[in-house]
Design a protein with these regions (language model features):
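Low-complexity, Pro/Ser/Thr- and charge-rich linker/hinge segments at domain boundaries
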Residues: 87-108, 113, 117
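Active-site-proximal helices and loops of the catalytic beta/alpha 8
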Residues: 209, 213, 227, 232, ...
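Beta-strand/beta-sandwich contexts
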Residues: 1-31, 87-89
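Substrate-binding/active-site clefts of carbohydrate-active enzymes
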Residues: 114-301, 306, 325-336, 340, ...
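Edge beta-strands of extracellular beta-sandwich domains
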Residues: 80-88
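Immunoglobulin-like IPT/TIG beta-sandwich domains and homologous Ig-like subdomains
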Residues: 16-78
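Loop/helix patches that line or flank the sugar-binding groove of alpha-linked glycan CAZymes
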Residues: 118-142, 146, 347, 411-420, ...
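C-terminal beta-strand-rich structural cap/linker in extracellular carbohydrate-active enzymes
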Residues: 586-602
Length: 602
């Protein structure tokens, strides 16, 4: 019969949901009959679907069940045997599942490209890699190959992230991607219960999260439920004929997410969007199959309980079945009410993104999704902060974008970002002079002081640049100094260029200000802004009698403004402190601004 695999590999007592699905896989195990004799645990039902190589067992774990090892006894072909299955005690004292919100700043990193550390046990690592069908080798000269970063490298640089000033880490996918090519990005899962051994082990992941928590850093885990990798065992031997959509791989998605809210959509177009494969190496899971969705839901809960992650970023969210994902959100949040989930809803228009946020009256169906990603700045901020603020251009675009927030049920629960691993970097080309940093500084200032949950992409603090013109790998370059053979170490201030030091210090200063005593003003405060006039954009965040006021000149030339129009937030003669310079600023009837100058007044 060969090796028997049980998913999940273990579980816990005391969970809110007492039902547990076990997927047992082995040759002809579908014909086995299972029984259990363990206090507080019973088998409610068991069955196989189309494949003889899977058996689904539904257990009820009663509140009085104790931690221990139970025996799943079974009879197959007249022979008796048993599988040992552990029930663990929940660690109710451990930090984790705390969620993330507008008081946080997420730092997105790709494990393969951030840093290579020393694995906890090289023998375990080597054995794990040897078990892969496509182990691959590191090739740092190839932008689309593995470069060798790992979980140990993240753990070894948590102090760097803390010193930078971020409060949460969004870690790109870490689960097994046993694929013949392109596996470094992690978005083609081949085992939902195993960290890719090239990145580390399940224990190393849990320990990294624990160390991050001790440093006051939250961890957000990237998950992918729309599709698997084409090398997943399910595609070769599906538990049921409808486990995947179009299992022959003859239909790709049309990527037209507008079909999901188009009142005139054809069924053909809608089906193509949701049921087509994302790419030929990423077959589309059928979330309408209840066994698929139960498996995926339990997998989420298992990783939260196993490692104590604080949030989930769900990839390609709208491409999965809306009703099934709505139930997934509800089920996960019922078990972990403080957790936050952000869905990748790739719309560059505000209405499309808002449609997916929970409690949206524009959507006749409830999504239960707390947080959505705001792709508009990714598509438009480079232009808005780079061109002159004249007529309707420049910072007027930022003003107009925020004016669309009426579409969102909760604008503070929008993940706002300028770039990520799937997009051109905000800096397509590296700046050469300090003057070139003007638009970048203004974009960072806005990102960290506007409404919502800001996310920055690794290397932003070092002015990393790149575009997707030739390859995705150009926007996923290695972090300088993350690998022992690197000649330049930008984790060390001494390894940074003068321009990088200027950028790092500026961004770090903003981040530390944001997580300081006025954090709640930015996280919870109201937002009031004024249309740019004479090229200067002004907005205020206020909570009670405390405020943060931002003024920025969106032009490359000096400008003056009449302050009477903003007197409702900056009374004439009042004195504030600019947190960038540390100098007092008196509100005069007329104020002058240098090219691209920023004031952050408290």
């Amino acid at each position: 019969m060969g090796c028997i695999k049980v998913d999940p590999p273990y579980w816990w007592t005391g969970m809110r949901d007492s039902t547990l699905q076990l997927m047992v896989s082995a040759r002809n195990i579908g014909y086995a009959e299972f029984s259990v004799n363990y206090p507080g645990v019973r088998i409610d039902r068991q069955f196989r679907l189309d494949s003889p190589n899977y058996r689904f067992i539904y257990l009820t774990i009663l509140p009085d069940a104790k931690p221990g090892v139970l025996r799943l006894n079974y009879v197959l072909g007249g022979r008796k045997s048993a599988i040992r299955f552990s029930l663990h005690e929940r660690d109710t004292c451990r930090r984790g599942a705390a969620g993330f919100d507008a008081g946080d700043v997420l730092y997105l990193l790709m494990p393969d490209r951030f840093a290579r550390g020393v694995p906890a046990d090289k023998r375990v690592r080597n054995k794990g890699v040897a078990s892969l069908t496509h182990p691959t080798t590191d090739d740092r000269e190839n932008p689309d190959a593995r470069h060798g970063g790992n979980i140990a490298g993240i753990r070894e640089h948590l102090d760097y992230l803390d010193s930078l000033g971020v409060t949460a880490i969004w870690v790109g996918p870490v689960l097994e991607n046993d694929m013949p090519g392109g596996s470094y990005h992690g978005y083609a899962t081949t085992d939902y219960y195993r960290v890719d051994p090239r990145l580390g082990t399940n224990d190393e992941w849990r320990e990294m999260v624990e160390v991050a928590h001790r440093r006051g850093l939250k961890v957000v885990m990237d998950m992918i439920f729309n599709h698997t990798g084409s090398e997943h065992r399910w595609l070769k031997d599906s538990p049921s004929a409808d486990w995947y959509n179009h299992p022959a791989g003859d239909k790709m998605t049309n990527y037209r997410l507008t079909t999901l809210h188009d009142p005139y959509v054809s069924q053909y177009d809608l089906d193509r969007t949701v049921n087509g494969w994302f790419v030929p190496s990423m077959p589309d899971l059928n979330q309408r199959n209840p066994e698929v969705m139960r498996y995926l839901t339990q997998n989420s809960i298992w990783w939260i309980e196993q490692s104590g992650i604080d949030g989930i970023r769900m990839d390609t969210y709208p491409y999965a079945d809306m009703q099934a994902m709505s139930k997934w959100c509800a089920d996960v949040l019922r078990e972990y009410p403080d957790l936050n989930i952000v869905g990748e809803c790739w719309y560059v228009n505000e209405a499309g993104a808002a449609y997916w946020q929970r409690s949206n009256r524009l959507n006749t169906r409830e999504t239960n999704l707390p947080t959505v990603m705001d792709f508009w700045p990714m598509a438009n901020a480079r232009r808005a902060f780079g061109e002159p603020t004249e007529c309707m251009g420049g910072l007027n675009e930022i003003y107009d974008h925020l004016a669309q927030d009426f579409l969102f049920p909760d604008p503070q629960r929008i993940l706002t970002f300028l770039d990520n691993h799937d997009t051109d970097r905000f800096l397509c080309e590296a700046p050469e002079t300090e003057a070139d940093l003007g638009p970048w500084k203004q974009a960072m200032t806005w990102l960290l002081t506007t409404r919502g949950i800001p996310q920055i992409y690794y290397g932003t603090e070092l002015l990393m640049s790149g575009t997707k013109v030739w390859t995705d790998g150009d926007v996923r370059r290695d972090m300088p100094g993350g690998f022992p053979e690197d000649e330049t170490d930008c984790f060390d201030p001494a390894g940074r260029t003068p321009l990088q030091r200027e950028a790092w210090d500026f961004l770090s200063g903003l981040l530390h200000f944001r997580r300081g005593e006025l954090n709640d003003v930015i996280a919870q405060g109201s937002l009031k802004h004024f249309m740019p006039e004479d090229g200067v954009y002004v907005y205020e965040r206020r909570l009670g009698d405390r405020s943060v006021t931002v003024l920025m000149n969106g032009n490359d030339e000096p400008r003056k403004i009449d302050t009477s129009r903003i007197s409702e937030i900056l009374p004439p003669g009042s004195v504030r402190t600019d947190i960038i310079s540390g100098e007092p600023v008196r509100v005069e009837p007329e104020m002058s601004f240098g090219p691209r100058q920023i004031l952050i007044l408290v």
